[in-house]
Amino acid sequence: MVPPTGERSLTKAISARALRKVYPGTPPVEALGGVDIDIADNEFFTLLGPSGCGKTTILRLIAGFEHPTSGSLDMFGQSLLDLPPYKRQINTVFQSYALFPHMSVAENIGFGLEMLGKPKSEIKSTVAEMMDLVQMSHLADRQTSQISGGQQQRVALARALAPKPRVLLLDEPLSALDFKLRKNMQLELKRLQTETGITFIFVTHDQEEALTMSDRIAVMSDGAIRQIGSPRDIYDHPADRFVADFIGDTNFLPADVIATEGERVSLRLGSGKTITAPARHAGGGRVTLAVRPEHARLEAEDSGLLPGVLSDAVYFGTDTHFHIALDDGTAFVLRQQNSPDTETRFAKGERVSVSFPGEVAQVLRD
């Protein structure tokens, strides 16, 4: 039974402990440095990070294309370490869809089932079900060389879903699509995952893809997981400076702790003004304050927390980005949503100040 939308199963589809992968060489290359991870059944889970961070290595270990150097890797409680790829009930969708151009849409979708020796009647009904799922029934007899990139993506997904895998791995499958089609496919992928109830493990370097589709995200760098959480938790409460910088746009401000009380901290900013903010870190010393551009506002010079000069205002249609050179030498960007009656009160070169409520500031230990 598929859990209701938004409710995650307690069953672990994938569980890894101290998972490590070292490639031989001079010197050896540690692609994965002892990762612990649990991915729930019926979860859309994303591995997010820059190139070379280890996210695709995890995917290849789960698929069975690589063998870990050490550590454990289980699927629904069964060890995968000695299980060959074809016995894992796992399918993979790659960046290149690897469709057969001389075959029709229906033939491509049914190819894997034929290789498994399924009866023709079962293949026919499953192919019809998959074409309906990805909304491609009207193109069943069209060759895949004659359909669009987005339609090819749907065929590749249908082919991977047809054998009813327990886990579907997706290795940056949207990167070849144009911007508008990519956004549409983000919604499509989440719909497919919800309707099928299959665990999706998605690899990407694109933060928007991760935030849009995922139930949870693992942010990775240098072969390690920096933070695992819901999109909102990771965006609003980054664990460290790397996560705050990689997910969304962020301003970083130096600050000094002057007092702590429970989970709140009083800080002195570079301007000499003070602010109280929630903090996971206790103690004194120098910290970094992370403030999202949309959480700040532009004010007159003597009204805000951080005085400076408005160096630029860039119009983006839906919003305007204001670039401020703060008096302490820090560059600050804030974002204001536009509306038909929006007016910019300040001109380039004018003295201004930046304000933000303490509740939206994230305190990061240096």
Curated annotation (Swiss-Prot):
This protein's record includes keyword Protein biosynthesis: no
Reaction catalysis annotation: ATP + H2O + polyamine-[polyamine-binding protein]Side 1 = ADP + phosphate + polyamineSide 2 + [polyamine-binding protein]Side 1
Compartments reported by the entry: Cell inner membrane
Origin superkingdom: Bacteria
EC numbers for this chain: 7.6.2.11
Keyword terms: ATP-binding, Cell inner membrane, Cell membrane, Membrane, Nucleotide-binding, Translocase, Transport
Its membrane topology: Peripheral membrane protein
Residues in ABC transporter domain copies: 14-247
Signal peptide residue numbers: none
One Gene Ontology molecular-function label: ATP hydrolysis activity
GO cellular component, one term: ATP-binding cassette (ABC) transporter complex
A UniProt-annotated Pfam family: ABC_tran
Binding-site residues for ATP, renumbered to this chain: G49, P50, S51, G52, C53, G54, K55, T56
Top-level EC class as recorded in UniProt: translocase
Cited NCBIfam families: potA
Subunit structure: The complex is composed of two ATP-binding proteins (PotA), two transmembrane proteins (PotB and PotC) and a solute-binding protein (PotD).
PANTHER family the UniProt entry points to: SPERMIDINE/PUTRESCINE IMPORT ATP-BINDING PROTEIN POTA, SPERMIDINE_PUTRESCINE IMPORT ATP-BINDING PROTEIN POTA
Family: Belongs to the ABC transporter superfamily. Spermidine/putrescine importer (TC 3.A.1.11.1) family.
Role, per record: Part of the ABC transporter complex PotABCD involved in spermidine/putrescine import. Responsible for energy coupling to the transport system.
Protein known as: Spermidine/putrescine import ATP-binding protein PotA
The gene coding this protein: potA
